[in-house]
C-alpha cells in the first residue's frame, strides 16, 4: 500500500512539482496549549451543521401554505398548520433517523455559537487580537454575528409556536427603528408579519447565503492564522520570532482528527439521549396562544433580557412615536461596534503599536481583564433577565421585582466585578513577584537562634554570598508555586488502571522519556543560541 501511495505521489510531483511546497507546509509547528482547541470545536461543529443540514433539506418544505395535519403524531391530527411545521413533524416522526439528525443539528448550532464565544473570550483575555492580528479579530466578530443570525433563522423555520413568537419580537424591533425600520422589515419579511414568503426568504438565507459567507470567512480566518503563524504563551525558549510545539504532520493532524471525532461523538450522544426543541409539544404558531416561558436559544436569550429590563422610554416626534424597544436595537449596535473596534481602542489608549506573537496572562493586564469580566457579568445578567418570568414563577417572586433586580444589577454588579477582578489581578502579580524574589514555600519550619520561627523557601535561581535568593525577572510565563512543579515530587509509577507495567516496560519507557527530555533541552539551548546570535547580529545586545 505504501509503495502505491509513493508511486502516486511521485507521479503527481513530476507533473505539478508540489513536494517542495507541501513539505514546507506540513512541517509547520503549532503550539500545544489546550485553549487553542476551542476554535477547533467551532470548526467541527460547523462541519457537522453542514452535513446534518444537507440531510434535513431533503425533507423540509419552508412553505407557509396552510394544510390539515394527518400524520404519525396523533395529538395534532386534524389541526391546521403550515407545510413548514408539518414537514418538521414528518422529519421528527416519519423520516428514518430524522429526529436524531434534527436534534444533532440543533445541538451543533448551539455548540458552534457557544464555542465561538468562548474562543473569542480566550482571544480577548490573552491579547491575541493585538497587532498584527486585528483583521482576524474582526473576522471572528463577524463570524459570531453571522452564527447568531444563522441560528435564529434556523430555529424560526419550523413555524412552531416558539419560533413564531421569536419572529414576531424581531419584527417589532425592526419596525420600531426610526426612518429605516419599515424598509428593513419589507426587505427581510417581504411585507407585513406574517408574510407568505418570509420563510422562503429565511430558508434561502439559512441554507445558502449565510453558510456560504461563513465558509468563506472561516477559510480567510484559517489562512491568516496559517500565514501569520500561531500565537503562543511565554515559556522556555519561546520568543516573538519562533513557535514551539508539534508539527502539523503527523501529530497535530492525528490529534485534530481525534478531537473532531470526540466532538462528533459528544453531539451524537446529546442528540440521542436528550430532547431539544420538542416542536410537537408547542403546536403551530398562533398569536392568541403566546404566553410566558417563550425564551429563545441561549445565545439569543440576552437580547430578550435586554428588551425585558429596558424601561418604557418612548420618544415622540410630532405625530411619530418611537417605541422603547428602539433602545434595545441601539444597545446591540453599540456593543457590536465596540467589540469590533476594541483592538484599536486599546492600542490608542496604551500606545502599544508593536507586533505581538507572545500571549499575555490575564493577570498581567488587569484593566483589560477587568473590562472583560465586567462585560461577561453584563451578558450573564441579561441572559438571566431573559427568563425573569420563569424565575418569578418558580420562586414565587413578583415579575416586577425581577425586572427591577435586573435593572439595578446591570448597574451595580458589573462595577463590582471590575473592582474585584482588578484587585485579584494585582494580588496575583504580587504573588508571582514574591516567589521570584524569595522562592517557593517548602512547608519546612525552622527555628532561629533568637527563638523566632521562619518557613524555609526554595530559591528558583542563584543565591548571593549570604545564601539569600537573587530576585529573578518576570518573563510573562507561569511561575511555579509548588515544589512538585520543580521535580521534587516522587516519580509516578507507570501502568494501567488495574496494575503497573512490567519492570522491563517501565524501565524502557523511562529511558525513552529521559532521552526525549535531553533532546528537548538540547533543542531549547540551540534555539536560545540562535536567538542570541541573531540579536547580536542585529545590534540588540
Curated annotation (Swiss-Prot):
Keywords per UniProt: Cell membrane, Electron transport, Heme, Iron, Membrane, Metal-binding, Respiratory chain, Translocase, Transmembrane, Transmembrane helix, Transport
Membrane topology: Multi-pass membrane protein
Keyword Heme attributed: yes
InterPro entries: Cyt_b/b6_N, Cytb/b6-like_sf, Di-haem_cyt_TM
Listed cofactors: heme
Broad class of enzyme this protein falls into: translocase
UniProt keyword annotation of Membrane present: yes
Domain of life: Bacteria
List of residues binding heme 2: 119, 221
Enzyme Commission identifier(s): 7.1.1.8
GO-annotated biological processes: respiratory electron transport chain
Annotated binding of heme 1, by residue: 105, 206
Transmembrane region(s): 36-56, 109-129, 137-157, 169-189, 207-227, 256-276, 325-345, 371-391, 408-428
Gene Ontology cellular-component annotations: plasma membrane
GO molecular function: metal ion binding; ubiquinol-cytochrome-c reductase activity
Function as written in the Swiss-Prot or TrEMBL entry: Cytochrome b subunit of the cytochrome bc1 complex, an essential component of the respiratory electron transport chain required for ATP synthesis. The bc1 complex catalyzes the oxidation of menaquinol and the reduction of cytochrome c in the respiratory chain. The bc1 complex operates through a Q-cycle mechanism that couples electron transfer to generation of the proton gradient that drives ATP synthesis.
Family according to the record: Belongs to the cytochrome b family.
Subunit field text: The cytochrome bc1 complex is composed of a cytochrome b (QcrB), the Rieske protein iron-sulfur (QcrA) and a diheme cytochrome c (QcrC) subunit.
This protein's name: Cytochrome bc1 complex cytochrome b subunit
Species of the source: Corynebacterium efficiens (strain DSM 44549 / YS-314 / AJ 12310 / JCM 11189 / NBRC 100395)
Gene (UniProt): qcrB
